[in-house]
């Protein structure tokens, strides 16, 4: 369908991403738990699980000073509002078998979070009628799971000249 003309507007059928999710591998926390932290005295946050992309997050109520490991694309569980990238994590007692992470400073809300519908909102215009389809349109269609769209029929054109008035 590359280089074909779109016959009708193509709209997003749903939000993409479908929910707030992690932009990086890391640990999700509630930023409010870091409000009173000072650099000289950190706070341990208990690791309570892991969320991978495609997992449905646990709906169990989060306790104060808890964290959950989260993979890129993993949906943010209820009660968590920010992601600390894995590269910035201090593990306790050690990296090989961590039970806690150590946080030594205030963390801003919504860091490294991709919000529901931040790429496409439900009913967003993806491709306008009359547009010639390019490769970036195909990426958007694939991202949204749209496999078929209506395109205009390729016209059959025949050129034929008569006479010698168009020659030298």
Model-derived features: positions:
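Phosphate-interaction motifs
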Residues: 1-147
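Glycine-rich phosphate/diphosphate-binding loop of Rossmann-like nucleotide-binding domains
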Residues: 36, 144-168
